[in-house]
Amino acid sequence: MKKSFLFATMAACAAGATTLGACATDGDTQKAAPPPSTTWTPTADAGADAPSPEDDAGSCAECEYFPETCTDDVLCPNGLFDATGTGTGLTPMARINVIRGRSRSDVWAAGAMGALAHFDGTSWTISDPGPKETLRALLLRNPGEIVFGEATKIITRGLPVEGAGEPSSGGWTTRPYSMLDWEYYDPFALKLATAWSSPDSERVWLAMTAHTAGATDGLWRLRITPSAPPEIIRALPPYTCSAVPCSQLLAMDGVEASSFWAVGMGGAIVRVTDAESDSPSITAFNSQSWNALQGVWTTSANEAWTVGTQGTIRHWVGDPLVWEVATDVPTNVDLYSVWGSSGNDVWVVGDDAVVLHYDGEHWSRMKIAGLGRRRPTLTAVWVSEPGHVWVGGDGVILSLGGKP
């Protein structure tokens, strides 16, 4: 990595976020998922991922990255989506927004219009969350799971929390927030971007994107206990995000309960420390970019990665102020998500079916088989261990060799 400093932008990056005009679509108008009772074993080249006659029309763009045959070192479709209308999978109109797992045999994927599914190491099973809203965040707890759509409620499974309604057929219950800070928290002026929490913590952090930069805070905390309804409370002093670029956030991640990273519009990067205390601290960092940062992954307490529009990739290795610029990135498309198993095994996904891999020295573009002429936007990636990668996006979910 080559480290260069843009001193002229340091003060600006710490002072406030810059509004950009466009973000990735989250599929709010797409169709709902089918009933939750269907279970099937994935195959490498079946379902919605098989090319249609329309896919075969026209010339092949970047053919070398899109072979017809699935091999062990190539990403391939892994079932889950249904292009035939038989009801055996998610509609290909759905987008996967987030993938998270506890292990190779316990993986969840969530997305547009209530799309939600679980992989048990062998097969995918659709799970009905109840509300058919776009799901933007997914937390795996000890025990239970939480998914988030709108900024006014949570949807939980396996959590003993007060105020739950009747469960869905998938075992999920919806719980509205008890809002303690109505004076400052306006869910109609904010769009929920994502959520983050340590699996055992009662506190869940919410990252929001304000319609106007600096108009309201983009970081809030949700308190979840078995004895009371979920309560949304202030995480930072009022108007903090007028001075620090935290009003238009898009992604969060951390490796320990006490600290995490949040990134967003205008190249914003902030680090929250003492995250479990009543008085957390927030520090702005210099990303050396004004591009929107749309994904972040924390490798360790001393290393993290973030990705964004126009092929932006930044790497943090402990500097007190500045993130390094990744120099040999082989694309300029918008990038949405980053994950890995270590600093030498990092995966990034984005527009035009672009998947990148970093081996500790160089970035390379990965091949995808079985797409025909399709070049779907890829918006989610999660890695359980080296060689076991899940990638999701518009009407597709992929794995190496099409295998778990």
Give the residues covered by each predicted segment.
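Bacterial N-terminal signal peptides that target proteins for export
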Residues: 1-13
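Metal-dependent phosphoesterase/phosphodiesterase active-site architecture
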Residues: 16
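Residue-level hotspots at or immediately adjacent to binding/recognition sites across diverse folds
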Residues: 25-30, 34-404
